[in-house]
Every structure is written in C-alpha cells, then in structure tokens.
Amino acid sequence: MSMSDPIADLLTRIRNAQMVAKPTVSVPSSKVKIAISQVLKDEGYIDGFQVKTEDGKTELVITLKYYAGRPVIERIERVSRPGLRVYKASASIPQVQNGLGVAIVTTPKGVMTDRKARATGVGGEVLCYVA
C-alpha cells in the first residue's frame, strides 16, 4: 500500500510511540526522514537513530528521549502537507513557542532548523513544528 504523506506518518509514529512510552520506533527509511531525524537529534529531542537494512528494505529505528518519565517532545505537528504546501522566505519563517521549539525547514541547502535557515538567509518548505 502506498503512503500519501510519509513525513506525517513518521511524525505520527513518533507521537504514538511516546504516548505509550516505547523506547524506540521503526519507520521505513528515506533521505528526508533521516535528515529530519538528524535535526531532532542535534536539537536534543531524540537520543539517536540507526538505519538498518533487512531483506533489501531499509528501516529507520529512532531511539526516543524521556525526561523524568515524560517525553521530551511535547508537541510535534505537520505544517506543509501534500494538499497544501507551505513555503516561507527566510525572514518570514515562524518561531515556535517564542524560540523554545523549532520549525524544521527543507531548503536548497538541506533540511535545517528555523534558526539556522534565518541565519543562513535561505527560505524553504516548513515541514513541521516541534516543541
């Protein structure tokens, strides 16, 4: 079965796994999902991730992070979706919770946080908000 929005599927799997306090979550792998996972790791929202290949299928295994028994990610939501793409210039990329959260943006220079996109002066598609 084909998936219409694989990024939304990744975010939903992370959200659902954290609600039941799972230590890891597995999703089908892609370059964009790996880049999003790298941003989440760099920002301290997940402990890490691994790419595993089994029977010709690559799978991304994300190790979730908890603090005092509660998930570090309080809110993770998709912004740009297949039916309504959201593009922003570098100056108009929104701040999430007055800078406490991050917006993950895909730009011509790769997937990065809203702060890095503003600092480098590039805009792009706003994939999701994480807080």
Curated annotation (Swiss-Prot):
Gene Ontology MF terms in the entry: rRNA binding; structural constituent of ribosome
Keywords: Ribonucleoprotein, Ribosomal protein, RNA-binding, rRNA-binding
Listed name of the protein: Small ribosomal subunit protein uS8
GO biological process: translation
Superkingdom in the source lineage: Bacteria
Assembly information from the UniProt record: Part of the 30S ribosomal subunit. Contacts proteins S5 and S12.
HAMAP family: Ribosomal_uS8_B
A Pfam entry, by short name: Ribosomal_S8
InterPro entries membership: Ribosomal_uS8 (IPR000630), Ribosomal_uS8_CS (IPR047863), Ribosomal_uS8_sf (IPR035987)
Similarity-based family: Belongs to the universal ribosomal protein uS8 family.
Record's function text: One of the primary rRNA binding proteins, it binds directly to 16S rRNA central domain where it helps coordinate assembly of the platform of the 30S subunit.
Stored PROSITE patterns: RIBOSOMAL_S8
UniProt-listed Gene3D superfamilies: 3.30.1370.30, 3.30.1490.10
Gene Ontology CC: one annotated term: ribonucleoprotein complex
Record organism: Variovorax paradoxus (strain S110)
